[in-house]
Amino acid sequence: IPHFHDTEDRLCQLRASAQADVCGRVREAGPELDFIFSREQELGTLCRMQRSGALPLRVTHNDTKLNNVLLDEKTGCAKCVLDLDTVMPGLSACDFGDAVRFGASSAAEDETDLSKIFLRLDMYRAYLEGYLDACGHALTENEICVLPLGAKIITIELGMRFLKDYLDGDIYFKIDRPT
């Protein structure tokens, strides 16, 4: 999937959708667009580091959440990884970040009460410890340093994808409640 976690490209796509405003939703989405575009420099950090050679490409899953792991019913141990259609070269920080986005959240992905959604630091620390125990020996110092940034960027990147789709008329992410 070309440019899947290319946050700079996602920013360009979002900007184009905002400029086109085909559904007349930009005014309503103004605060969200301001939030994202005011962080543009930070959001491009991983892309710039990869282009400069500071971060290597790895084999990544790109949809690292618990429901993409088949667990043994008796032992609870992982049997295999599922949903392999997004496996491709990518950054370790993106896989780690996506796992944290999903697994260290205080609420389900589709929670509508925003006051219930926050990062569970205990779960974040557990993810970080487990990730480094399992593969830290294979990561560069730069990769380890940007793992926290990966969690932030991937979370905002997914928000950008949702926002772009909203501006475009809810084409990819189907919704079942008022916008």
Please give the residue ranges for each predicted region.
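Surface-exposed helix-capping loop/turn segments at secondary-structure junctions
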Residues: 1, 135-142
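ATP-dependent phospho-/nucleotidyl transfer catalytic cores
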Residues: 1-61, 66-80, 153, 174-178
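A structural signal for short hydrophobic/aromatic patches embedded in well-ordered alpha helices
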Residues: 36, 127, 146-147
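Conserved helix-loop functional segments at active or binding sites
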Residues: 41-49, 84, 102-105, 133, ...
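Catalytic activation segment of kinase domains across protein kinase-like and atypical kinase folds
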Residues: 53, 67-108
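Active-site capping/gating regions of soluble enzymes
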Residues: 64, 123, 147
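Active-site activation/catalytic loop segments of kinase-like enzymes and analogous catalytic loops
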Residues: 89, 93-137, 153-172
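All-alpha amphipathic helical-bundle segments outside canonical DNA-binding/catalytic cores
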Residues: 139-151
